[in-house]
């Protein structure tokens, strides 16, 4: 079954025959409540953030050829694929984000991987490429289980790749950051074994008398 994205709102609550309480707004803002997104949808959003609001349509099919040899038009197959994947193409080149909001989000994503208090700092602290990222631990509401997420992009100042790692019932999102790190390393032709050794090594402190 294909999933459509759901952005939590009062209208969605009404469809579920639920009351939208003031606290729901806070829950929705941090990704809880009725929000529902697929990894591909999240990858599109992350790419848009990395590009400072520029919208890139998702393309997963290069061409489709009919049995008679004719080619299916791009508009036709894109419409079909987007419907099945629950994607919405906004038909706009850029989203109207305030510059200060984008900057705040980007700096927050930089801090996740590069600042000592970041939830993915231990994974990326010695990584040779600066990565913007966000870990996520999504409560499922079922027996205390949590889905693990990591979304990110690299390099930070000149993005080439957006990435999403999702593990159902995977626990804390920091675990998925390790998978994302290795995928990024592979994409840029880095030695993944060496990357793992460098980023997981325990830092030492030299005491000078």
Tell where the protein language model's regions lie, with residue ranges.
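Glycine-rich loops and low-complexity Gly/Arg-rich segments
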Residues: 54-55, 156, 175-178, 187-192
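Short, gly/Ser/Thr-rich active-site loops of penicillin-recognizing serine hydrolases
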Residues: 71-72, 84, 181-209
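Beta-lactam-recognizing serine transpeptidase/beta-lactamase-like catalytic domain environment
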Residues: 3-168, 205-209
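Short amphipathic alpha-helical face segments that pack within enzyme cores
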Residues: 38-44, 175-182
């Amino acid at each position: 079954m294909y999933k459509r994205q759901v952005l939590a709102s009062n209208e969605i609550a009404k469809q579920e025959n639920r009351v939208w309480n003031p606290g729901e707004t806070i829950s929705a803002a941090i990704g809880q409540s009725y929000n529902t997104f697929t990894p591909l949808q999240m990858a599109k959003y992350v790419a848009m953030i990395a590009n400072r609001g520029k919208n890139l349509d998702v393309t997963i099919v290069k061409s489709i050829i009919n049995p008679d040899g004719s080619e299916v038009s791009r508009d036709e197959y894109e419409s079909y694929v987007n419907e099945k994947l629950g994607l919405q193409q906004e038909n706009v080149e850029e989203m109207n984000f305030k510059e200060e909001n984008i900057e705040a989000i980007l700096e927050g994503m930089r801090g996740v991987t590069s600042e000592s208090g970041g939830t993915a700092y231990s994974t990326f602290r010695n990584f040779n490429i600066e990565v913007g990222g966000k870990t996520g631990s999504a409560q499922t509401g079922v027996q205390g289980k949590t889905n693990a997420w990591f979304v990110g992009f690299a390099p930070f100042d000149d993005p080439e790749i957006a990435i999403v790692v999702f593990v159902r019932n995977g626990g804390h999102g920091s675990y998925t950051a390790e998978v994302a790190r290795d995928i990024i390393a592979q994409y840029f032709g880095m030695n993944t074994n060496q990357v793992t050794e460098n980023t997981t090594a325990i830092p030492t402190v030299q005491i000078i008398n």
